Amino acid sequence: MEGFKRYVEVGRVVLVTKGEYTGKLAVIVDIVDHKRALIDSPCSEFPRQVIRYGSVVLTHIVMKLPRGARSGIVAKKWKAQDVCNKWASSAWAKKLEAKKVRSQLNDFDRFAVMRLKKQRREQVNVAVAKALKA
């Protein structure tokens, strides 16, 4: 049995899921209590603030950061450790981006996607039939 992999810790990068800054990345700078943490984000225009753990999701990215680091230090470490690019290259970020693109499709675009999926499914079925026949 495997335990938790994502712990609430200083330097853990989080994704905000509720409130005004939904979808923004931030990093835990300090732990206030068992329900709240101080977060800061140099990547997006996002003020340093205390936020509830229920309003964020912990990501797999952890920065090396001293406890209670000020915004300037956080910004330097953020750039040095290339957090924005690590996030952008993750499957999670790609899935969120795809979901956003899919939600903005109009009716004709959804129809075109359906046709392409049908074509792909047909090609797969033909290939499987050939493989079984051979």
UniProtKB/Swiss-Prot annotation:
Keywords of this entry:
Cytoplasm, Nucleus, Ribonucleoprotein, Ribosomal protein
The record's SUPFAM superfamilies line, in alphabetical order, gives: Translation proteins SH3-like domain
MF (Gene Ontology): RNA binding; structural constituent of ribosome
Q: What is its main location?
A: cytoplasm
The record's InterPro entries line, in alphabetical order, gives:
KOW (IPR005824), Rib_uL2_dom2 (IPR014722), Ribosomal_eL14 (IPR039660), Ribosomal_eL14_dom (IPR002784), Translation_prot_SH3-like_sf (IPR008991)
Q: Which residues cross the membrane?
A: none
Q: Which GO terms describe its biological process?
A: cytoplasmic translation; ribosomal large subunit biogenesis
Cellular component annotations (GO), alphabetically ordered: cytosol; cytosolic large ribosomal subunit; nucleus; preribosome
Role of this protein: Component of the ribosome, a large ribonucleoprotein complex responsible for the synthesis of proteins in the cell. The small ribosomal subunit (SSU) binds messenger RNAs (mRNAs) and translates the encoded message by selecting cognate aminoacyl-transfer RNA (tRNA) molecules. The large subunit (LSU) contains the ribosomal catalytic site termed the peptidyl transferase center (PTC), which catalyzes the formation of peptide bonds, thereby polymerizing the amino acids delivered by tRNAs into a polypeptide chain.
Cell location: Cytoplasm; Nucleus
Q: Which family does it belong to?
A: Belongs to the eukaryotic ribosomal protein eL14 family.
**What name appears for this protein in its UniProt entry?**
Large ribosomal subunit protein eL14
Q: How does it assemble?
A: Component of the large ribosomal subunit (LSU). Mature yeast ribosomes consist of a small (40S) and a large (60S) subunit. The 40S small subunit contains 1 molecule of ribosomal RNA (18S rRNA) and at least 33 different proteins. The large 60S subunit contains 3 rRNA molecules (25S, 5.8S and 5S rRNA) and at least 46 different proteins.
